Amino acid sequence: MSQSPDDLLRDDLLKPALLNLDRASLNRRRFMSKLIQYGGLAVGSGVLTACAGQPTSQTTSQAPDPAASSPAASPSGELKKITYGTNWYAQAEHGGFYQAVATGIYRDYGLDVTIKMGGPQVNGTQLLMGGAIDFFMGYVSDAIKAVQENIPKVTVAAMFQKDPQVLLAHPESKAKSLADLKDRPTFIGAAANTTFWPFLKAKFSYSDAQKRPYNFNPAPFLADKTAVQQGYLSSEPLAIRKEGGFEPLVFLLADYGYDPYSTTIECKQSLVDQDPDLVQRFVDASIKGWYSYLNGDPAPANALIKQDNPEMTDEQIQYSIEKMKEYGIVVSGSAETQGIGSMTDERWKSFFDTMSGEGIFPSSLDYKKAYTLKFVNKGVDAYKS
């Protein structure tokens, strides 16, 4: 939304449909950055929708005709076919990419982009390295793990400045910060042990004794007013409101120093070496798609999102967009001046130091192989044209 030693990144395998929580309320990219099951969502000249092996349908995209006059397009006017794999079912958290399809931004850059929608069970890194996709929606800890495993992929942009991971508490707890949640029973998934739990232990002295297994069932949290539960900013708070009838206290870990980037763009190192212009065009067009989605009319992207994921609701989409804006998930930090997608050496080092300090990665690992800054940090004005 998505890292663990067994590559089940950022959470457990599947979310059970308990307490009648509809999948739309839990549709998120959370913790699943390598567990993706691809349907055939082709976008650009058309959209083929498929979800977890369900029958496909085709919808013609309303993007404009290829524009050879665009300075970013190829001289012949031909579009370069590109496939981008997401890490979860279609949702607002992927909106900028869908917007770039729906409004023709990718075409303006000479690209015919196919988005392959994610879901559980399929390994995105394998698809990337095997050539089934050209770019992948990744996550920082997985990128560093790839260096450790000598997998030659690289992160070229980060659409989310803040990871949307949150902890939720009952209003009766009167907690004011993450520090107030120390020693409370905390429901977390197994993959938290290699992502945000080491951070909480290092900074707030959380202990393993307070951990409780989280299986995407909010019932234990709802039943215990002293309990804490992990969540995704744009999903669980809304689900708790609807199922529990109250507004949970929400603590965004990123606002307390948990600083990995999220919703990244990854590709093979060989693509960066052999065709940097292609990488730059895809990154630039995706960034413009995010500006359009957040600052303009998101309806074109939302239509594609709902077409691909029929269980996604307007309520969930609107809630997600509001939270992304309210908390500065996409635009905050260096992105405020350097543009969406921005990354810095300092942020990567900070996250690596925290994780290596807790023994997740060896301190000698050359983590800088996990990313490059050459395609981002152009400045906000660079994306206004």
Model-derived features: positions:
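N-terminal secretory signal peptides
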Residues: 1-50
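Short, glycine-/small- and polar/acidic-enriched structural segments
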Residues: 42, 62-214, 218-223, 227-234, ...
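Bacterial lipoprotein signal-peptidase II cleavage site
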Residues: 52-61
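Short helix-capping segments at alpha-helix termini
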Residues: 105-108, 204-206, 243-245, 311-314, ...
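Short linear loop/turn motifs
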Residues: 114, 122-123, 254-255, 318-325, ...
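Pocket-lining segment of extracytoplasmic ligand-binding domains
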Residues: 141, 216-220, 224-313
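Secondary-structure end/capping motifs
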Residues: 275-360
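Conserved C-terminal helix/tail region of periplasmic/extracytoplasmic solute-binding proteins
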Residues: 345-385
